[in-house]
């Protein structure tokens, strides 16, 4: 069984050349993730891409994006490679496929295989949304021995289904990215104070149980969206609450740094299934169903990544 580990949910050229290396060298992180929104934020706001973008002028927008993004992914891969070589459970960087291909499994599979072949690094994970068509992609990629990060998982049912697919096919490392804080942002305005800032953690815990029950030893739960979205919570709140054995937490820098500075970090015991069910009954009394919320958040997440990718491409 793997222990709890931290990954960094951020990617940007200057960061990769400086603080990213420091975090790795001091043993703070052992992996990293990226997504279309992070690349949009980095490439459109950082000055470190401007000269390269200027040199690529005249090329198609997606070609410019891939040139920039793959360079960052390769740099992250190189920095993490010593960790991977020491322990192939660690040292991964994730790259997401074009979000506009999300509902086209054959094209998604082709793009994922092309990107993985182009990068030619064993510690690169291809990130695929766990939508209905996305799970077809997950299955195909695992059959092709490509490490997979199944992302935008909000539902325990989808967590179980994804874990079962990976258990059948996965010959390489895989993670199932369970999104956390978006639940609380959605639900907290609708519930009394004693139920606030709990839905994301409790839903993620149920997903964690499903993954550990149905996945193989190469697959781990990865808690994502663990930056706080409320000023009333400590920055490392979600990392600390979900510090479970055999799990990973990928966090934005603010949350990551807060957690690393916290002297009181230790393994947490996940809530019992009976406690989870009791909480869900309390939500039901407020006319809230976590499964319905999960479906809504998945749709919103898919749209948000498409919007970010479109914004990035149009900036070229």
UniProtKB/Swiss-Prot annotation:
This is Transaldolase. It comes from the Bacteria. It catalyses: D-sedoheptulose 7-phosphate + D-glyceraldehyde 3-phosphate = D-erythrose 4-phosphate + beta-D-fructose 6-phosphate. One of its GO terms (cellular component) is cytoplasm. Belongs to the transaldolase family. Type 2 subfamily. The active site is at 127 (schiff-base intermediate with substrate). InterPro entries: Aldolase_TIM, TAL/FSA, Transaldolase_2, Transaldolase_AS. One of its GO terms (biological process) is carbohydrate metabolic process. It is found in: Cytoplasm. CDD domains: Transaldolase_like (cd00955). Keywords: Cytoplasm, Pentose shunt, Schiff base, Transferase. It comes from Helicobacter pylori (strain Shi470). The gene is tal. Its EC number is 2.2.1.2. The keyword Zinc-finger does not apply. Pathway: Carbohydrate degradation; pentose phosphate pathway; D-glyceraldehyde 3-phosphate and beta-D-fructose 6-phosphate from D-ribose 5-phosphate and D-xylulose 5-phosphate (non-oxidative stage): step 2/3. One of its GO terms (molecular function) is transaldolase activity. Transaldolase is important for the balance of metabolites in the pentose-phosphate pathway.
